[in-house]
């Protein structure tokens, strides 16, 4: 399932996966240093040994008298020959040392430095990008919380207004109108929580905190050229240090968010261009008079006097008063509604801003993961080359060391970059690419212009289609596109290649907030990008088409019945029958499309396997990822079975459902009163609870009116038309699970108990038994 860095080091927070990869790559940097030190020592040893050999050939001649030298003596000739060979061996070792320095050590050192710098640069870029994403993520949570609080305040006020009589309401309105703007502001905000960073304070609590800050941190005058000197200032790092020492602010991100909110609340002012808070000694901030007044303290100096000499500063300081005058005639109801609209606008902008940042982070990480895999591959290949160079150097100069040179060649052949990459993935991978989308969640459950990351059932209900429009439109577009492609190989490859994430995100952005998904928009992009955005849509769903709660059950089926194909397919058929109607219809659409493509192309078996590897996580994925799952092949096998036997499974489901539907009609007509069973979704309390909770119509409502003659023929069958009686037990289970929030383990055990039995009657009895136990608890 995980075959490369680009699909192996992802995590929900992005930082965990990236950190794990760099920890592994740092081992390679350390290995480079060890090899470099070994080569240096080996070079020095050869150099010292060669010099020593030459030295001893000279030492042996000391004390020997020239007249005692007999050129004709054989012993003297042997002595001179031995001395010459030893001296020559010394020269060879010195030449080896020089070649090691110039041909191996110097290039290897350069490669090692370049490799280390590449990793450091990549790590710094990714760290900064992820930190920026985290800041925007925390900003989104803060703006969402503020928006929800404003909505609740408005609801509370409206409820209180309904309960009070008109006379009391008029008296309260008159009282608030007579009171001064400052008193009115204090009364209105007295019960509101003030949010600073990731903390919330009541006004009296914030008063104590501000008083302590202003009394403990050193305040000084700060001179700005031309504008003059400003009192009551300090640098950003002083404020951050105080916050981390005195408040539960564990991280710099949280501290900077706290400081940013001090600016937003009007307690602090940045001495310079812009209004951002930065933890730095170079950024200075002035505590406004509002902070001293709120804390019940007197500022050392007032900026009012400076304002007389500096009209620009006076205008800046009067913004707050102008704002209060602008809305002084508002009633409390108008003010609350305005604040809700303002908070909603800020929250929705934060969602869009975070989504853009997230896609940029994912594109950057994907590019860097590919780059880092290439860096590691090049490093290992360099090892392979330098082993061969070392063997050549030794064998050329010292034939007697041929055995050592041959052994080095053996070591060189052992090095396989692909194996090293695979080892890193198998031992340290954190998970495949499974993006986490933060969608705009309106307080009143209204999602209008979002497609990606939205639950498939909600999206289908909004589109008034049984299959989301984005899925059906893309599949229809591909059907029209296939005949125009050059060959079967091209038609297969567009499903197997991974398009650049930046291109996929560009099409995603064009579709996500558009009023409709059109083929005209799709035609502006390559086929592989269109298929890439379809895969991305499935990956960004809150849960996979085959829910994560069934992941362990599917694993159990393939572990226990991998060789018994008929029984395994029957269990899968039972599993699919319990999916939600929209999930069934969507799964049917994609599998039917792919099965038709497989049928019309050659090399069906190979294409099916490759396609299953590419799409397995789009159809079924676990709730959480771990190392044990990454070696699990059952998602791919499950996808292979769907691609191979899907049409047969769906046809069998249609036949079983048709016969059961006829029997249900006979029983209904022969009985004066409808049957009452625990699994029937026709119970009034079940239907009402589902409608009130999901705001989606009951699955039965679209099918109960069908007459037998209206049941689609085999050639027309898709799971969009599966009658609801087949999935009644699954829908009842899904409703109860949603409302009562069952644990994962209990849901898995109950599902396993259902699929062990082969008879549909036993399945219904098992569900009914479980329902009775749940109602008792």
Curated annotation (Swiss-Prot):
Residues 3-420 form the F-BAR domain. SUPFAM superfamilies: BAR/IMD domain-like (SSF103657), GTPase activation domain, GAP (SSF48350), Winged helix' DNA-binding domain (SSF46785). It comes from the Eukaryota. The record marks 496 as: Arginine finger. GO terms for biological process: cytoskeleton organization; establishment or maintenance of actin cytoskeleton polarity; small GTPase-mediated signal transduction. Residues 213-296 form the DEP domain. Pfam families: DEP, FCH, RhoGAP. This is Rho-GTPase-activating protein 8. Keywords: Coiled coil, Cytoplasm, GTPase activation, Phosphoprotein. Residues 117-172 form a coiled coil. PANTHER family: PROLINE-SERINE-THREONINE PHOSPHATASE INTERACTING PROTEIN 1 (PTHR23065), RHO-GTPASE-ACTIVATING PROTEIN RGD2 (PTHR23065:SF17). One of its GO terms (cellular component) is cell cortex of cell tip. Residues 667-709 are annotated as: Disordered. It comes from Schizosaccharomyces pombe (strain 972 / ATCC 24843) (Fission yeast). Interacts with pak1/shk1. It is found in: Cytoplasm. The gene is rga8.
């Amino acid at each position: 399932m995980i075959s490369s860095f680009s699909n192996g080091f992802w995590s929900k927070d992005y930082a965990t996966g990236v950190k794990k990869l760099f920890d592994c790559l740092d081992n390679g940097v350390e290995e480079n240093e060890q090899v470099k030190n070994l080569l240096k020592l080996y070079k020095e040893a050869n150099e010292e040994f060669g010099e020593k050999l030459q030295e001893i050939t000279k030492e042996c001649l000391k004390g020997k008298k020239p007249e005692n030298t007999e050129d004709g003596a054989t012993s003297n000739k042997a002595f001179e020959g031995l001395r010459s060979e030893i001296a020559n061996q010394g020269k060879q070792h010195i030449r080896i040392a020089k070649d090691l320095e110039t041909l191996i050590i110097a290039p290897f050192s350069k490669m090692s430095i370049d490799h280390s710098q590449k990793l450091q640069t990549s790590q710094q870029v990714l760290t900064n990008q992820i930190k920026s994403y985290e800041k925007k993520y925390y900003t989104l949570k803060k703006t969402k919380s503020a928006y929800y609080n404003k909505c609740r305040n408005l609801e509370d006020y409206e409820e209180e207004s309904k309960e009070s009589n008109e006379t009391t309401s008029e008296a309260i309105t008159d009282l608030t109108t007579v009171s001064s703007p400052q008193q009115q502001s204090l009364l209105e905000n007295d019960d509101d929580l003030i949010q600073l960073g990731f903390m919330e304070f009541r006004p009296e609590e914030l008063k104590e905190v501000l008083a302590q800050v202003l009394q403990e941190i050193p305040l000084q005058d700060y001179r700005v050229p031309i504008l003059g000197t400003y009192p009551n200032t300090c640098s950003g790092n002083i404020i951050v240090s105080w916050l981390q020492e005195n408040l539960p602010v564990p991280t710099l991100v949280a501290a900077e968010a706290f400081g940013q909110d001090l600016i937003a609340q009007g307690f602090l002012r940045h001495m310079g261009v812009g209004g951002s808070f930065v933890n730095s000694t170079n950024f200075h901030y002035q505590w406004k008079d509002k902070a001293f007044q709120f804390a019940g303290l007197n500022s050392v100096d007032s900026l009012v006097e400076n304002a007389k000499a500096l009209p620009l500063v006076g205008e800046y300081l009067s913004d707050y008063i102008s704002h209060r005058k602008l809305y002084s005639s508002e009633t409390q109801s108008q003010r609350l509604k305005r604040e809700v609209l303002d908070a909603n606008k800020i929250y929705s902008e934060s969602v869009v801003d975070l989504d853009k940042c997230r896609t940029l982070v994912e594109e950057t990480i994907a590019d860097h993961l590919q780059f880092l895999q290439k860096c590691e591959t090049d490093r290992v290949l360099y090892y392979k080359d330098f082993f061969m160079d070392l063997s050549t150097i030794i064998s050329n100069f010292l034939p007697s060391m041929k055995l050592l040179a041959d052994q080095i060649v053996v070591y060189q052949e052992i090095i396989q970059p692909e194996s090293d990459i695979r080892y890193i993935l198998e031992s340290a991978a954190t998970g495949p690419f499974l993006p986490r989308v933060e969608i705009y969640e309106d307080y009143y459950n209204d999602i209008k212009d979002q497609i990606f990351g939205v639950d498939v059932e909600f999206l289908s209900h909004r589109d008034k289609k049984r299959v989301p429009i984005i899925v059906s439109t893309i599949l229809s577009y591909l059907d029209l596109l296939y005949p125009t492609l050059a060959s079967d190989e091209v038609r297969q490859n567009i499903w197997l290649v991974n398009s650049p994430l930046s291109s996929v995100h560009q099409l995603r952005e064009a579709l996500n907030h558009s009023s409709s998904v059109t083929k005209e928009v799709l035609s502006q992009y390559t086929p592989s990008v269109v298929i890439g955005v379809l895969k991305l849509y499935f990956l960004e769903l809150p849960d996979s088409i085959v829910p994560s709660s069934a992941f362990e059950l599917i694993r159990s089926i393939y572990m226990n019945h991998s060789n018994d194909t008929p029984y395994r397919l029957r269990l899968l058929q039972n599993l699919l029958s319990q999916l939600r109607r929209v999930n069934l219809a969507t799964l049917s659409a994609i599998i039917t499309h792919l099965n038709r493509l497989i049928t019309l192309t050659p090399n069906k078996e190979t294409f099916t396997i490759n396609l299953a590897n590419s799409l397995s996580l789009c159809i079924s994925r676990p709730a959480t990822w771990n190392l044990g799952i990454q070696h699990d092949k059952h998602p791919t096998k499950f996808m292979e079975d769907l691609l191979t036997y899907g049409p047969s499974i769906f046809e069998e489901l249609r036949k079983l459902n048709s016969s059961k539907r006829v029997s249900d009609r006979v029983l209904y007509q022969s009985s004066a009163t409808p049957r009452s069973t625990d699994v029937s979704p026709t119970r009034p309390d079940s239907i009402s609870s589902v409608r009130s909770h999901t705001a989606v119509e009951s699955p039965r409502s679209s099918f109960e009116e069908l007459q037998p003659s209206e049941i689609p023929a085999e050639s027309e069958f898709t799971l969009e038309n599966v009658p609801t009686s087949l999935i009644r037990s699954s829908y009842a289970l899904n409703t109860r699970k949603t409302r009562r929030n069952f644990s994962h383990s209990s849901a898995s055990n109950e599902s396993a108990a259902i699929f062990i039995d082969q008879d549909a009657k036993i399945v219904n009895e098992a569900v009914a038994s479980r329902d009775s136990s749940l109602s008792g608890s």
